[in-house]
Amino acid sequence: PAASEGGNERHAAFNNANTAIEGVDPDALYLLSSTSEAYSWLIKLLCDAGDAVLAPKPGYPLIESIARLECVDTVEYQLQFDGSWFIDIAELERLLSEPGGERIRALVLINPNNPTGSYVKPTERARIVTLCREHGIALIADEVFFDYSLEPFPGNARLAGERGVLTFALDGFSKMLAAPHAKVGWIQVSGPAEDVAEAQRRLDVIADDYLPMSDIIAERIPALLNAAPAQTR
């Protein structure tokens, strides 16, 4: 749906080597021109005009800007600090349960967060996955800075490959290679099989309409993947 078969298979092999969950299906990967484009696709996929997404504060102003272009609101949840940064799960529960919470279609996690550098901790992850499942919302995990470990808590792990709830994990070369001009991003879709199948049917339509990845760029992906580990040491 997004690039050459060989390009997707190489990405799957790379993701298998860099996540705790083996067996990435090449068909679960969507290659795009950037992770910014990935946000746009996912908001189109998950939201109608007037819906909302949850996004962290501090976080990217870009998320609100892209959501606004899709006529979607951003509801902020505040990260808290008690010596280290953490997600206030009670606040997430309140935002999803209060009047207007039914408009929320996705929760954005930035793992690790920019600008705080804080990772999603294992206990937070478990509760957030349960919360998203209970409220029928998707999880968008932005992991472009994952390999830059400023807060090495035990149990730091990618959300890519999460099976407990419909999850869209974002990554890309511009951060992985420390090269802002290397504008290639991707989405990895995971979660319960039925939810993934339905999401991919719809995401395929978006991918086929935009056709963001040319073979000229895809042919360079193997070399970029090989260069990635050295760039983040």
Label every PLM stretch briefly.
Residues 70, 134-135, 163:
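Helix C-cap/helix->beta junction micro-motif
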Residues 161-233:
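Conserved core segment of the aminotransferase class I/II
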Residues 55, 76, 139-141, 169:
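Hydrophobic residues in well-ordered beta-strands that form the structural core
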Residues 81-154:
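Active-site phosphate-binding strand-loop segment of PLP-dependent enzymes
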Residues 3-52:
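Phosphate-binding glycine-rich loop
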Residues 45-67:
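Conserved PLP-anchoring active-site segment centered on the Schiff-base-forming lysine
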